[in-house]
Amino acid sequence: MHGRLPLTAQTHRRLVVKVGSAVLSGPQGRQHQLAIAAQVAALRAEGREVVLVSSGAQATGMQKLGLTEKPKSMPGKQALAAVGQPTLMLLWEQAFSWYDLKVAQVLLTAEDLAHRHRYLNARQTLETLLEWGIVPIINENDTVMVEEIKFGDNDQLSALIASLVGADLLILLSDIEALYEADPRTHPEAQPIPYVERVDAGVLRMAGDSPNRVGTGGMKSKLLAAEKAQAAGIPHLLLPGTRPQSIAEALQGAPVGTLFAGGQRRYSGRKLWLYQLPKPQGEVVVDAGAAKALRQGGASLLPAGILEVRGQFGVGEAVRCLDEQGNLIGVGLVNYSAAELARIKRRKTREIEALLGYKNTDEAIHRDYFALASELE
């Protein structure tokens, strides 16, 4: 048993709190929402900053339309989110108004955070909102998402946001009370695990499927979020969102839920951003010489080393670099689009301008914007 210490406002000032759909839906959903607003207000009164990541647009849309099952088609889900998101924000605004706290809606897509410039713009906006004393409420922009580049669920989004704003702690409020030794639905004797030092393969195996009709994130998703947070050195609390004072109790050191240690920060800056990117859609295959130079570290990828370009991508997007055997070398940001690279592959840098009519840079991928696969594990 690991004794948990208090997480004070002095050491854990900036928090990201994610609320799951299952907590906000159902007959008790509004009561849970009001209780969470009260807890956030109490955190603010302690001098902490809070960014809220709220699921529930589709679940709220289901309630408004009287549906019992979520549509299976992507357009149906997007329309449902469009119906539910305004009401979800109104409910949050009303809940926080009891404590004279103002809120701001921030809708993001995976594509927003996959572009470095937009990523930094999002950070600046959130920093400004926090400086103004406003509670940012973030959700994935479901109405414009596409399956190939969506976050997957708000557990993953919350981990990215925690990294984006440099949070001291990530809190996931869920209908899942804690990480258990085994699935408590099929193993009633299973005990909750109060503390996890590191999310490894053994811990991931503890995750069972926990589907529900309104949400998308089960235990595996929460463990993957914890893994992302650990890479940034951010501790993560998994707490029961239906328990009125679960945040306060956990921050005081009570064995509520599961605390995942932050550990040593493995990445920072651009490398951390590359590690947390959604799966890149494009690929470039490089020759043996380029593969060796990239793997040894410190080298940029030049067009001459590119043998093949796969997929569609634009300037500044992330692509996977593969060797001729199909092994992943790493992930980097391209200085040319897929169409441009297809024209200048296997060519010398001095030929770029003649082939394209212009030259952005000599490098297809600069070494400062490339992370080896071994760094991303």
UniProtKB/Swiss-Prot annotation:
**Mostly located where?**
cytoplasm
Instruction: State its Enzyme Commission number(s).
Output: 2.7.2.11
Instruction: Give the matching InterPro entries.
Output: AceGlu_kinase-like_sf (IPR036393), Asp/Glu/Uridylate_kinase (IPR001048), G5K_ProB (IPR041739), Glu/AcGlu_kinase (IPR001057), Glu_5kinase (IPR011529), Glu_5kinase/COase_Synthase (IPR005715), Glutamate_5-kinase_CS (IPR019797), PUA (IPR002478)
What is the role of this chain? Catalyzes the transfer of a phosphate group to glutamate to form L-glutamate 5-phosphate.
Under NCBIfam families, the record lists: proB
Can you tell me which family this protein belongs to?
Belongs to the glutamate 5-kinase family.
What this protein catalyses is: L-glutamate + ATP = L-glutamyl 5-phosphate + ADP
Record flagged with keyword Cell membrane:
no
HAMAP family the UniProt entry points to: ProB (MF_00456)
Q: Where in the cell is it found?
A: Cytoplasm
The segment(s) forming the PUA domain are 281-359
What's the protein called, per UniProt? Answer: Glutamate 5-kinase
- The reply on keyword Cytoplasm is yes
The processes (GO biological process) annotated in the record are: L-proline biosynthetic process
Do you know which Pfam families this protein is assigned to?
A: AA_kinase, PUA
Which residues are recorded as binding substrate?
S55, D142, N154
Q: Which Gene3D superfamilies match?
A: Acetylglutamate kinase-like, PUA domain
Molecular function in Gene Ontology: ATP binding; glutamate 5-kinase activity; RNA binding
Q: In which pathway does it act?
A: Amino-acid biosynthesis; L-proline biosynthesis; L-glutamate 5-semialdehyde from L-glutamate: step 1/2
Q: Which UniProt keywords apply?
A: Amino-acid biosynthesis, ATP-binding, Cytoplasm, Kinase, Nucleotide-binding, Proline biosynthesis, Transferase
